[in-house]
Regions:
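Conserved nucleotide-sensing/catalytic segment adjacent to the nucleotide-binding pocket
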Residues: 54-56, 60-108, 113-114
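Small-molecule kinase domains that catalyze NTP-dependent phosphoryl transfer to phosphate-bearing small molecules
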Residues: 152-186
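Post-Walker A helix-loop "phosphate-sensing" segment adjacent to the P-loop in P-loop NTPases
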Residues: 43-54
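P-loop (Walker A) phosphate-binding loop of NTP-binding proteins
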Residues: 29
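Extreme N-terminal, non-catalytic leader segments
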Residues: 1-25
Length: 186
């Protein structure tokens, strides 16, 4: 499904449950367009609901370039599991420059929709704790180009390392198959 139709389908599914503060997961390989899709969804839901959905980026949860699995577990332990128990979620953003989680504690108690975007957000465990899941894909060459363009090529050396973690994670969790909606973003 193309991005425009996918966006409409996502809104059709999420809008009726928006008052129930749904948890929406947006996953896909690096460079597939998850962040732009999530920001557009957040803005459109804000326009419709007159309340801003919370947006969490997995980039704030990974403990560095080797941390895709750890970031996925951090999402579960510190955000999704507490919210599933009607508790406040507390977490520290990972500081990629300081290479630590020390810093300001962030919290979220629910009450508005939550959108989590990023590689590893959609696992077997996280799917059980969410209300709607979206998988976004794009051809590998396009994803690689987007990855390089996003930060001016300064992180190109990490592409293969990250991609191999994605291979392992997605073959284990079969994230695309867990989604309610699959979008091809060429």
């Amino acid at each position: 499904m193309n991005p425009e139709l996918g966006f409409s389908k996502a809104l059709e599914a999420i809008e009726p449950i928006a008052d129930e503060a749904p948890i929406v997961l947006i996953d896909g390989r690096t460079g597939s367009g998850k962040t732009d899709f999530a920001l557009n969804l957040q803005n459109e839901l804000f326009r419709i609901l007159d309340q801003a959905p919370r947006l969490i980026s997995m980039d704030d949860l990974y403990p560095g370039w080797g941390g895709l699995n750890e970031g996925a577990l951090y999402l579960l332990r510190h955000i999704l599991i507490p919210l599933s128990k009607n508790q406040t979620a507390y977490w520290n953003r990972y500081d990629w420059h300081a290479k630590s989680r020390e810093g300001k504690l962030t919290s979220f108690s629910g009450g508005t929709p939550l959108i989590v975007e990023g590689c590893g957000s959609l696992s077997m465990a996280s799917r059980e704790l969410s209300d709607y899941a979206i998988w976004i894909s794009a051809p590998e060459q396009i994803r690689r180009e987007r990855f390089s363009e996003r930060d001016g090529g300064i992180f190109d050396e990490f592409y293969e390392k990250w991609s191999s973690q994605e291979d392992e994670f997605y073959s284990t969790h079969r994230s695309a198959e867990l989604s309610n909606l699959r979008i091809e973003n060429p």
